[in-house]
Amino acid sequence: IAFSRNLPKGVARPVGWEVLKLKAVRDPWPGSHVRQAMVLTGSDVRGTIYAIYEFSRRSLGVDPIYWWTDHPPARRTSVVIPAGFEEQQGSPTFRYRGWFMNDEDLLTVWRPGKADKTGISLAVWDRIFEALLRLKGNMIIPNTFIFPYEPQVRAAGDRGLAITQHHMEPLGLNVYQWPDNVPYSLD
């Protein structure tokens, strides 16, 4: 996995929004013990994430939704990359692509641990985020009635996903939380 500072000679960092590049390189770092390398890089962080997942799909046979379909990838003893292999996928047609986790209560059968403090286990949230990234998504609405301090919001951001909202959280504010120290009445 290469970023600008460690790209092998002859491999240029792609340019654009979320562009990924895969390239087989011989003698990538002259003078080192590495004779061949498969370079996975991107124009930005998500482009690099997509390069990793594209390599795992194409070369390792990992289905983007393997966990959800109960089809784990087959174990491999070796991977053959054709000499001179190179692929670059340009910027996506649509700048933002994502999911709205509507009816997320249907996933609550995967109970969270007490430390999760969320309706769905953080381990399951991680699988949701992984599948979205493997499918080259980049944004998510993680819940209805979500608060910005909830752990799944941070977890999505840590995975490189943009957080967005829908009509229930105008401007990112969940208006259904009333401060504990302010009296209210439904009368």
Listing of model-derived features with the role each one plays in the protein:
Residues I1-S91:
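Contiguous, structured surface segment used for ligand recognition
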Residues I1-L7, T93-D187:
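Aromatic-lined carbohydrate-binding surfaces of glycoside hydrolases
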